[in-house]
């Protein structure tokens, strides 16, 4: 099969000739190819493309203005004015490129923004504060209601360069010393995560003395004690007092949470989020009397019966246009690839075949866990095997776009329409390791179902199918807890995604847990509920 074309193409109009359109598109595709960048691309007029090249691309909705002569490349599958996904993907690349172009190296994020970024906070700030001595204080308006607050201010003595996007940040220890007490109380998860990242005492003590951070040092030491790192706290305090540096220790938090040190911010963040979310999930659990004990034969029967509905709903949630007759043909096993491709888009055909194979592997793994294999709490270890099954047809027919089956993603992974920026791909293994430890230790299957779904989606361990695997894992744990295999119907998909987005951005998991509980209950007694969502009561 011919490999699917992946370059950006659009039909041109508004009086732009085909020659102008083609030349502009070729120039843009060459830039993207040279950068190895398919998402998040930033274009500066006059530097990257000429005005004659930019004009047709703007007219044709390929480039979208940010400010001045800066543009981002739109998502070719959606309309930019309806979906901010492409802007979210481009945001941090723009910030780094724009500020470098204006100020060279004379800028950095504010101390608070530096800590939020270091803490693996995936949210895009509505207003980003940066410091520079090269400009007066002013605000730069950005798309979708975002702002860049440029503050005229000196820079810290040392500025650190961040590799993922090219940002310039406060050094970690200086940022913690410099932030106001309100940061600890408004952003306790991020503050605790950064305290867990702190290096040895020498650099911290030196930064405190050099900057004269008497009050900040007291908060830092008190914060370390609060998170359970008394050893480092005492060492820093001893170094400061030996240097005759006055410090009054105070706990900047409203309560203590013991986390211990960790060199990976996302690992600490996941553990803190789990601790915060778990009680909320338990409060939304369905009543125990609704649970049943599934036999292996009943699990197989249920999964066989539900596959077509599950595939239609789950693939649609991932943006695929898969028809019932295609799913029915694949599930029936009597099909020919070329024939299916005459009736549907090839990518939809391949992904349906792949999902069927992944679903069957999930079924095998669940039955194995019920008949003497490793317990269901270990099923998250099988995600890469499920990924391999999903990707095999795509790889066979040249549709995998370079993605490696049975491996964590090797590139950025963005979520359509979300303000959450998933884990940097380099840190995905560490994030999954932290999640694994939490899932294995958790004895409540409903908690594993909800938080497993959430964190797999939050991390996005693979480029293609993370949402699919999150829901497959959720259902594996629902079965383990005595709940039925649960399908999120098409008419509820948007509300379900909104609850998931709320959890990603705000950390509030209750709505998501409530919807999973309700859909699970509805799978038991659908005729009695008449499809009424409790959110509508």
Please tell me what each predicted stretch does:
Residues 1-66, 78-537:
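FIC/Doc superfamily catalytic core
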Residues 69-75:
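Minor-groove-contacting beta-hairpin "wing" of winged helix-turn-helix DNA-binding domains
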